[in-house]
Protein backbone atom coordinates (compact mmCIF):
# COMPACT_ATOMS: atom_id res chain seq x y z
CA UNK A 1 0.00 0.00 0.00
CA UNK A 2 1.41 3.35 -1.04
CA UNK A 3 2.23 5.86 1.68
CA UNK A 4 0.12 8.99 1.87
CA UNK A 5 2.59 11.86 1.68
CA UNK A 6 1.26 15.40 1.87
CA UNK A 7 3.05 18.33 0.19
CA UNK A 8 5.24 20.46 2.44
CA UNK A 9 3.14 23.56 1.77
CA UNK A 10 0.03 21.75 3.02
CA UNK A 11 1.87 20.60 6.13
CA UNK A 12 3.08 24.14 6.82
CA UNK A 13 -0.45 25.53 6.40
CA UNK A 14 -1.85 22.93 8.79
CA UNK A 15 0.74 23.70 11.46
CA UNK A 16 0.35 27.47 11.18
CA UNK A 17 -3.44 27.23 11.30
CA UNK A 18 -3.24 25.43 14.64
CA UNK A 19 -1.03 27.92 16.49
CA UNK A 20 -1.87 31.44 17.63
CA UNK A 21 0.07 34.35 19.12
CA UNK A 22 0.75 33.95 22.82
CA UNK A 23 -0.56 36.23 25.56
CA UNK A 24 1.00 39.66 26.01
CA UNK A 25 3.69 40.36 28.57
CA UNK A 26 5.39 43.62 29.50
CA UNK A 27 9.17 43.64 29.41
CA UNK A 28 11.93 46.31 29.60
CA UNK A 29 12.54 47.98 26.25
CA UNK A 30 16.10 46.65 26.05
CA UNK A 31 14.81 43.09 26.32
CA UNK A 32 12.37 43.69 23.44
CA UNK A 33 15.18 43.91 20.87
CA UNK A 34 14.64 41.27 18.20
CA UNK A 35 10.91 40.89 18.81
CA UNK A 36 7.80 42.58 17.36
CA UNK A 37 5.85 45.14 19.34
CA UNK A 38 2.34 44.08 20.25
CA UNK A 39 1.00 47.65 20.31
CA UNK A 40 1.77 50.98 18.66
CA UNK A 41 4.32 53.07 20.57
CA UNK A 42 3.33 56.75 20.79
CA UNK A 43 5.68 59.59 21.79
CA UNK A 44 4.56 61.37 24.96
CA UNK A 45 6.66 64.46 24.19
CA UNK A 46 8.44 65.98 21.22
CA UNK A 47 11.65 64.13 20.35
CA UNK A 48 13.86 66.12 20.81
CA UNK A 49 11.86 68.38 23.15
CA UNK A 50 14.03 71.40 22.26
CA UNK A 51 16.37 72.61 19.54
CA UNK A 52 19.90 71.56 20.50
CA UNK A 53 23.44 71.85 19.30
CA UNK A 54 24.84 69.18 17.01
CA UNK A 55 28.42 69.94 18.10
CA UNK A 56 30.63 71.90 20.47
CA UNK A 57 30.93 75.53 19.42
CA UNK A 58 29.26 78.92 19.72
CA UNK A 59 25.56 79.70 19.43
CA UNK A 60 25.11 82.80 17.28
CA UNK A 61 22.61 84.95 15.45
CA UNK A 62 23.33 84.29 11.79
CA UNK A 63 22.44 87.92 11.03
CA UNK A 64 25.53 89.03 13.00
CA UNK A 65 27.84 87.07 10.70
CA UNK A 66 26.44 87.94 7.27
CA UNK A 67 29.48 90.08 6.43
CA UNK A 68 32.08 87.94 8.19
CA UNK A 69 35.13 86.95 6.09
CA UNK A 70 38.84 86.34 6.42
CA UNK A 71 39.55 89.93 5.44
CA UNK A 72 36.79 91.38 7.65
CA UNK A 73 36.18 89.05 10.60
CA UNK A 74 33.40 89.70 13.10
CA UNK A 75 34.07 89.76 16.85
CA UNK A 76 31.35 88.76 19.34
CA UNK A 77 31.14 88.93 23.13
CA UNK A 78 30.79 85.60 24.94
CA UNK A 79 27.98 86.10 27.48
CA UNK A 80 27.59 82.58 28.79
CA UNK A 81 28.43 78.91 28.68
CA UNK A 82 25.98 76.07 28.17
CA UNK A 83 26.59 72.35 28.56
CA UNK A 84 24.18 69.46 28.03
CA UNK A 85 21.81 69.35 30.97
CA UNK A 86 22.28 73.06 31.74
CA UNK A 87 20.12 75.83 30.32
CA UNK A 88 21.34 79.36 29.58
CA UNK A 89 18.60 81.49 31.08
CA UNK A 90 19.20 84.63 29.06
CA UNK A 91 18.81 85.52 25.39
CA UNK A 92 21.45 86.30 22.79
CA UNK A 93 21.36 89.84 21.46
CA UNK A 94 23.21 91.61 18.66
CA UNK A 95 26.97 91.18 18.94
CA UNK A 96 26.69 88.33 21.47
CA UNK A 97 27.37 84.60 21.52
CA UNK A 98 27.19 81.69 23.99
CA UNK A 99 29.71 78.87 24.25
CA UNK A 100 27.67 75.67 23.77
CA UNK A 101 28.29 71.95 24.07
CA UNK A 102 26.82 69.14 21.97
CA UNK A 103 23.24 68.36 22.99
CA UNK A 104 22.70 71.58 24.93
CA UNK A 105 19.57 73.65 24.17
CA UNK A 106 20.14 76.43 21.64
CA UNK A 107 19.65 79.72 23.55
CA UNK A 108 16.83 82.11 22.77
CA UNK A 109 17.82 84.45 19.97
CA UNK A 110 20.36 82.10 18.40
CA UNK A 111 19.63 80.33 15.11
CA UNK A 112 22.97 78.67 14.31
CA UNK A 113 26.01 77.06 15.92
CA UNK A 114 29.54 77.57 14.65
CA UNK A 115 31.88 74.71 15.49
CA UNK A 116 34.61 75.49 17.98
CA UNK A 117 37.52 74.57 15.68
CA UNK A 118 36.92 77.46 13.24
CA UNK A 119 36.41 80.17 15.88
CA UNK A 120 39.37 82.26 17.08
CA UNK A 121 39.49 83.02 20.82
CA UNK A 122 40.94 86.52 21.23
CA UNK A 123 41.19 86.61 25.01
CA UNK A 124 40.30 84.58 28.07
CA UNK A 125 39.40 80.90 27.96
CA UNK A 126 36.67 81.20 25.36
CA UNK A 127 33.89 81.16 27.95
CA UNK A 128 31.89 84.00 29.51
CA UNK A 129 33.78 87.32 29.38
CA UNK A 130 35.91 86.32 26.41
CA UNK A 131 35.84 87.73 22.90
CA UNK A 132 35.82 85.43 19.89
CA UNK A 133 36.29 86.09 16.18
CA UNK A 134 34.38 84.59 13.21
CA UNK A 135 35.76 84.60 9.67
CA UNK A 136 32.79 83.20 7.74
CA UNK A 137 28.99 83.56 7.69
CA UNK A 138 26.73 81.01 9.40
CA UNK A 139 23.59 79.63 7.78
CA UNK A 140 20.28 79.60 9.62
CA UNK A 141 19.96 76.18 11.26
CA UNK A 142 23.63 75.32 10.82
CA UNK A 143 24.65 72.60 13.32
CA UNK A 144 21.28 72.84 15.04
CA UNK A 145 19.05 69.83 15.63
CA UNK A 146 15.47 71.04 15.40
CA UNK A 147 12.93 70.43 18.13
CA UNK A 148 10.69 67.43 17.32
CA UNK A 149 13.08 66.40 14.54
CA UNK A 150 12.44 62.73 15.39
CA UNK A 151 8.76 62.95 16.29
CA UNK A 152 6.06 65.22 17.70
CA UNK A 153 4.14 64.39 20.84
CA UNK A 154 1.37 61.98 19.85
CA UNK A 155 3.21 60.57 16.83
CA UNK A 156 3.50 56.81 16.43
CA UNK A 157 7.24 56.14 16.63
CA UNK A 158 6.96 52.37 16.15
CA UNK A 159 4.00 50.40 14.85
CA UNK A 160 2.58 47.17 16.22
CA UNK A 161 4.32 44.27 14.52
CA UNK A 162 7.53 46.19 13.90
CA UNK A 163 10.57 44.28 15.12
CA UNK A 164 12.52 46.25 17.70
CA UNK A 165 16.17 46.76 16.75
CA UNK A 166 18.75 47.73 19.39
CA UNK A 167 18.50 51.34 18.20
CA UNK A 168 14.73 50.99 18.41
CA UNK A 169 15.04 50.30 22.13
CA UNK A 170 16.62 53.75 22.42
CA UNK A 171 13.84 55.29 20.34
CA UNK A 172 11.21 53.74 22.60
CA UNK A 173 13.02 55.08 25.65
CA UNK A 174 13.08 58.56 24.08
CA UNK A 175 9.33 58.28 23.55
CA UNK A 176 8.81 57.64 27.25
CA UNK A 177 8.71 53.84 27.37
CA UNK A 178 10.59 52.00 30.09
CA UNK A 179 8.77 48.81 29.10
CA UNK A 180 6.64 47.60 26.20
CA UNK A 181 4.21 44.77 25.49
CA UNK A 182 5.24 41.82 23.34
CA UNK A 183 3.90 38.33 22.84
CA UNK A 184 5.35 36.03 25.46
CA UNK A 185 8.00 33.52 24.51
CA UNK A 186 6.13 30.23 24.09
CA UNK A 187 7.32 27.38 26.27
CA UNK A 188 8.36 24.50 24.02
CA UNK A 189 8.65 21.10 25.64
CA UNK A 190 11.33 18.88 24.10
CA UNK A 191 11.54 15.11 24.63
CA UNK A 192 14.03 12.65 23.17
CA UNK A 193 12.70 9.15 22.51
CA UNK A 194 14.77 5.98 22.37
CA UNK A 195 16.20 3.34 24.70
CA UNK A 196 19.48 3.62 22.79
CA UNK A 197 20.01 7.23 23.90
CA UNK A 198 22.22 8.42 26.76
CA UNK A 199 22.83 11.95 28.03
CA UNK A 200 25.60 14.00 26.33
CA UNK A 201 27.87 13.75 29.36
CA UNK A 202 27.71 9.95 29.54
CA UNK A 203 29.96 7.48 27.78
CA UNK A 204 27.73 5.34 25.54
CA UNK A 205 27.97 1.57 25.84
CA UNK A 206 27.80 -0.75 22.85
CA UNK A 207 24.52 -0.14 21.01
CA UNK A 208 24.01 3.27 22.62
CA UNK A 209 24.45 6.78 21.23
CA UNK A 210 24.53 10.20 22.82
CA UNK A 211 21.36 12.28 22.61
CA UNK A 212 22.42 15.08 20.26
CA UNK A 213 18.96 16.06 19.03
CA UNK A 214 17.78 17.56 22.31
CA UNK A 215 20.73 19.98 22.42
CA UNK A 216 20.21 20.98 18.78
CA UNK A 217 16.45 21.38 19.17
CA UNK A 218 16.78 23.44 22.34
CA UNK A 219 19.28 25.73 20.61
CA UNK A 220 17.00 26.04 17.57
CA UNK A 221 14.00 26.73 19.80
CA UNK A 222 15.85 29.48 21.65
CA UNK A 223 17.04 30.99 18.36
CA UNK A 224 13.46 31.02 17.05
CA UNK A 225 12.36 33.10 20.05
CA UNK A 226 10.87 30.50 22.37
CA UNK A 227 11.76 29.08 25.78
CA UNK A 228 12.94 25.46 25.51
CA UNK A 229 12.07 23.07 28.34
CA UNK A 230 13.79 19.69 28.24
CA UNK A 231 11.89 16.77 29.74
CA UNK A 232 14.60 14.20 29.32
CA UNK A 233 15.02 10.94 27.46
CA UNK A 234 12.13 8.47 27.34
CA UNK A 235 12.92 4.80 26.68
CA UNK A 236 10.92 2.77 24.15
CA UNK A 237 8.09 2.24 26.59
CA UNK A 238 4.52 3.43 26.03
CA UNK A 239 3.91 4.38 29.65
CA UNK A 240 7.19 6.29 30.03
CA UNK A 241 6.54 8.18 26.80
CA UNK A 242 2.96 8.97 27.78
CA UNK A 243 4.00 10.29 31.19
CA UNK A 244 6.56 12.71 29.76
CA UNK A 245 4.30 13.85 26.92
CA UNK A 246 1.37 14.45 29.29
CA UNK A 247 3.54 16.51 31.60
CA UNK A 248 4.94 18.56 28.72
CA UNK A 249 1.45 19.19 27.32
CA UNK A 250 0.26 20.46 30.70
CA UNK A 251 3.23 22.78 31.23
CA UNK A 252 4.06 24.02 27.73
CA UNK A 253 2.52 25.77 24.72
CA UNK A 254 4.05 23.44 22.14
CA UNK A 255 5.55 19.96 22.44
CA UNK A 256 8.27 18.52 20.21
CA UNK A 257 9.67 15.00 20.31
CA UNK A 258 12.50 13.50 18.29
CA UNK A 259 12.54 9.80 17.53
CA UNK A 260 9.55 7.50 17.49
CA UNK A 261 8.02 9.03 14.38
CA UNK A 262 8.62 6.29 11.81
CA UNK A 263 7.07 2.84 11.41
CA UNK A 264 9.40 0.85 13.67
CA UNK A 265 8.20 -1.70 16.22
CA UNK A 266 9.08 0.61 19.10
CA UNK A 267 7.80 3.89 17.68
CA UNK A 268 4.87 4.57 19.99
CA UNK A 269 4.49 8.30 19.60
CA UNK A 270 2.11 8.46 16.63
CA UNK A 271 -0.10 5.82 18.22
CA UNK A 272 -0.22 7.92 21.39
CA UNK A 273 -1.33 11.00 19.48
CA UNK A 274 -3.98 9.04 17.58
CA UNK A 275 -5.31 7.53 20.77
CA UNK A 276 -5.39 10.64 22.95
CA UNK A 277 -5.54 13.52 20.51
CA UNK A 278 -5.77 14.12 16.79
CA UNK A 279 -3.20 13.36 14.13
CA UNK A 280 -3.38 15.93 11.33
CA UNK A 281 -0.59 14.41 9.23
CA UNK A 282 2.17 11.86 9.70
CA UNK A 283 4.06 11.82 6.41
CA UNK A 284 5.44 14.66 4.27
CA UNK A 285 6.76 14.53 0.72
CA UNK A 286 10.16 15.80 1.86
CA UNK A 287 13.70 14.52 2.30
CA UNK A 288 15.08 14.49 4.89
CA UNK A 289 12.08 14.55 7.22
CA UNK A 290 9.44 12.34 5.62
CA UNK A 291 8.31 10.78 8.90
CA UNK A 292 6.91 13.76 10.81
CA UNK A 293 3.77 13.65 12.93
CA UNK A 294 1.75 16.75 13.71
CA UNK A 295 -1.39 16.83 15.75
CA UNK A 296 -3.10 18.12 18.86
CA UNK A 297 -2.85 16.79 22.39
CA UNK A 298 -4.92 18.47 25.05
CA UNK A 299 -5.51 21.30 22.60
CA UNK A 300 -1.75 21.92 22.31
CA UNK A 301 0.23 21.56 19.07
CA UNK A 302 2.45 18.49 19.00
CA UNK A 303 5.26 17.86 16.51
CA UNK A 304 6.96 14.48 16.33
CA UNK A 305 10.26 14.71 14.47
CA UNK A 306 12.48 11.94 13.18
CA UNK A 307 15.37 10.77 15.30
CA UNK A 308 17.78 11.32 12.41
CA UNK A 309 19.59 14.61 13.17
CA UNK A 310 19.33 16.05 9.64
CA UNK A 311 15.65 15.11 9.38
CA UNK A 312 14.94 16.65 12.78
CA UNK A 313 16.80 19.81 11.77
CA UNK A 314 14.98 20.24 8.46
CA UNK A 315 11.65 19.39 10.07
CA UNK A 316 12.20 22.04 12.72
CA UNK A 317 13.24 24.65 10.14
CA UNK A 318 10.26 24.00 7.89
CA UNK A 319 7.53 23.50 10.52
CA UNK A 320 8.44 24.34 14.11
CA UNK A 321 10.34 27.56 13.51
CA UNK A 322 7.55 29.24 11.48
CA UNK A 323 5.02 28.18 14.13
CA UNK A 324 7.11 29.61 16.97
CA UNK A 325 7.55 32.89 15.11
CA UNK A 326 3.80 33.16 14.59
CA UNK A 327 3.29 32.54 18.30
CA UNK A 328 5.70 35.41 19.06
CA UNK A 329 3.75 37.74 16.80
CA UNK A 330 6.14 37.95 13.85
CA UNK A 331 4.59 38.80 10.50
CA UNK A 332 7.44 37.13 8.60
CA UNK A 333 7.65 33.43 9.42
CA UNK A 334 9.59 31.94 6.48
CA UNK A 335 13.34 31.99 5.94
CA UNK A 336 14.45 34.03 2.92
CA UNK A 337 14.90 32.16 -0.36
CA UNK A 338 17.25 33.28 -3.11
CA UNK A 339 18.62 31.94 -6.35
CA UNK A 340 22.16 30.72 -6.81
CA UNK A 341 24.16 28.92 -9.47
CA UNK A 342 25.14 25.29 -8.93
CA UNK A 343 28.85 24.55 -8.97
CA UNK A 344 28.29 20.86 -9.71
CA UNK A 345 25.68 18.42 -10.96
CA UNK A 346 22.92 16.97 -8.77
CA UNK A 347 20.84 13.91 -9.65
CA UNK A 348 17.55 13.16 -7.89
CA UNK A 349 15.60 9.97 -8.56
CA UNK A 350 12.89 10.24 -5.91
CA UNK A 351 9.69 12.22 -6.24
CA UNK A 352 9.91 13.93 -2.85
CA UNK A 353 11.14 17.50 -2.41
CA UNK A 354 14.77 17.54 -1.28
CA UNK A 355 16.48 19.93 1.10
CA UNK A 356 20.19 19.27 0.79
CA UNK A 357 22.70 20.90 3.10
CA UNK A 358 24.84 23.34 1.15
CA UNK A 359 26.95 26.48 1.26
CA UNK A 360 26.29 29.58 -0.79
CA UNK A 361 29.09 32.07 -1.44
CA UNK A 362 29.52 35.07 -3.70
CA UNK A 363 32.18 34.82 -6.39
CA UNK A 364 34.62 37.66 -5.54
CA UNK A 365 35.34 38.34 -9.21
CA UNK A 366 31.91 38.12 -10.85
CA UNK A 367 29.66 38.75 -7.86
CA UNK A 368 27.63 35.68 -8.80
CA UNK A 369 26.08 33.62 -6.00
CA UNK A 370 27.40 30.06 -6.14
CA UNK A 371 26.00 27.11 -4.19
CA UNK A 372 27.85 23.90 -3.39
CA UNK A 373 26.30 20.86 -1.75
CA UNK A 374 27.93 19.25 1.26
CA UNK A 375 30.01 16.26 0.15
CA UNK A 376 27.67 13.90 1.98
CA UNK A 377 23.98 14.17 2.77
CA UNK A 378 24.12 11.40 5.40
CA UNK A 379 21.25 12.30 7.75
CA UNK A 380 23.21 11.21 10.83
CA UNK A 381 26.10 13.64 10.34
CA UNK A 382 25.98 16.89 12.31
CA UNK A 383 29.08 18.59 10.92
CA UNK A 384 27.50 19.25 7.53
CA UNK A 385 24.60 21.03 9.26
CA UNK A 386 26.97 23.08 11.40
CA UNK A 387 28.83 24.33 8.33
CA UNK A 388 25.90 24.77 5.94
CA UNK A 389 24.44 28.25 5.52
CA UNK A 390 21.59 27.17 3.27
CA UNK A 391 19.40 24.30 2.18
CA UNK A 392 19.42 23.55 -1.55
CA UNK A 393 15.75 23.13 -2.44
CA UNK A 394 15.02 20.65 -5.22
CA UNK A 395 11.32 20.46 -5.95
CA UNK A 396 9.21 17.33 -6.46
CA UNK A 397 9.93 14.92 -9.26
CA UNK A 398 13.06 13.14 -10.53
CA UNK A 399 15.55 15.50 -12.12
CA UNK A 400 19.15 15.92 -13.14
CA UNK A 401 20.65 19.34 -12.49
CA UNK A 402 23.89 20.42 -14.10
CA UNK A 403 26.66 22.76 -13.03
CA UNK A 404 25.58 26.25 -14.05
CA UNK A 405 21.87 25.65 -13.42
CA UNK A 406 20.13 28.26 -11.28
CA UNK A 407 18.43 26.82 -8.20
CA UNK A 408 16.59 28.02 -5.09
CA UNK A 409 18.34 28.01 -1.73
CA UNK A 410 16.77 28.55 1.69
CA UNK A 411 19.07 30.82 3.71
CA UNK A 412 19.14 29.31 7.19
CA UNK A 413 21.82 31.81 8.21
CA UNK A 414 19.57 34.85 7.68
CA UNK A 415 16.54 35.96 9.69
CA UNK A 416 13.06 35.92 8.27
CA UNK A 417 12.14 39.10 6.42
CA UNK A 418 15.69 39.70 5.14
CA UNK A 419 15.57 41.52 1.81
CA UNK A 420 18.00 39.87 -0.61
List PLM regions with ranges:
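Short, low-complexity N-terminal leaders and the immediately following helix N-cap/first helix
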Residues: 1-69, 99, 330-355
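Residue-level signal for inorganic ion chemistry
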Residues: 15, 57, 154, 190, ...
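Flexible glycine/proline-rich
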Residues: 25-30, 39, 85, 106, ...
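Generic secondary-structure signature for well-ordered alpha-helical cores
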Residues: 13-24, 38, 42, 124, ...
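Solvent-exposed alpha-helices and their adjacent loops that cap or buttress functional pockets
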Residues: 51-53, 66-71, 89-93, 106-108, ...
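Short, glycine/charged-enriched hinge/interface segments at domain edges or termini
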Residues: 2-3, 8-9, 59-235, 370, ...
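Generic structural signal for well-ordered, non-membrane alpha-helical segments
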Residues: 4, 8-12, 25, 29, ...
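Helix-rich terminal scaffold detector
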Residues: 1-8, 178-305, 309-315
Amino acid sequence: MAEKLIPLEDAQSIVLSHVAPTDLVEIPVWQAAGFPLAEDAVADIDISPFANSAMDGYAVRSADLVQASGEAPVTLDVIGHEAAGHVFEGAIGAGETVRIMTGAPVPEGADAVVKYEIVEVLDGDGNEGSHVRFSAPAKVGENVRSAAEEAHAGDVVMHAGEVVAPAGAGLLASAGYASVKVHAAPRVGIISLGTELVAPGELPARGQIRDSNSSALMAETLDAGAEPVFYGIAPDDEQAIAELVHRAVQECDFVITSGGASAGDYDFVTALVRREGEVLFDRISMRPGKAITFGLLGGKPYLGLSGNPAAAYVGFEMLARPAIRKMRGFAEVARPVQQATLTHGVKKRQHRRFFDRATVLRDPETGELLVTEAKTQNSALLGTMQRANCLLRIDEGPCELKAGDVVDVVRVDLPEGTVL
